[in-house]
């Protein structure tokens, strides 16, 4: 074995298997690009992003860890969100929750 070497089984790896998901249409109404990282609480994203925030509470982008989605000014795109796991407590970000979901 080589340090850092990975042994991966054949087949597909499904991210976030079995978790609740929702697809939302998101519009950037601002004049600057907005980038949202994989583990950012989507409910608390930049107010220039217009979407159903109620449905996004407790959710994050359903993308690989360490990646992001960029919304250009005037752009509307559909994104899939996935439920946050663990203790489902949210602190920081924009300070809109600061506790249990």
UniProtKB/Swiss-Prot annotation:
Its EC number is 3.5.1.5. It comes from the Bacteria. It is found in: Cytoplasm. One of its GO terms (cellular component) is urease complex. It catalyses: urea + 2 H2O + H(+) = hydrogencarbonate + 2 NH4(+). Pathway: Nitrogen metabolism; urea degradation; CO(2) and NH(3) from urea (urease route): step 1/1. GO terms for molecular function: urease activity. GO terms for biological process: urea catabolic process. Pfam families: Urease_beta. The keyword S-adenosyl-L-methionine does not apply. Keywords: Cytoplasm, Hydrolase. Belongs to the urease beta subunit family. Heterotrimer of UreA (gamma), UreB (beta) and UreC (alpha) subunits. Three heterotrimers associate to form the active enzyme. This is Urease subunit beta. It comes from Bradyrhizobium sp. (strain BTAi1 / ATCC BAA-1182). The lineage of its organism: Bacteria, Pseudomonadati, Pseudomonadota, Alphaproteobacteria, Hyphomicrobiales.
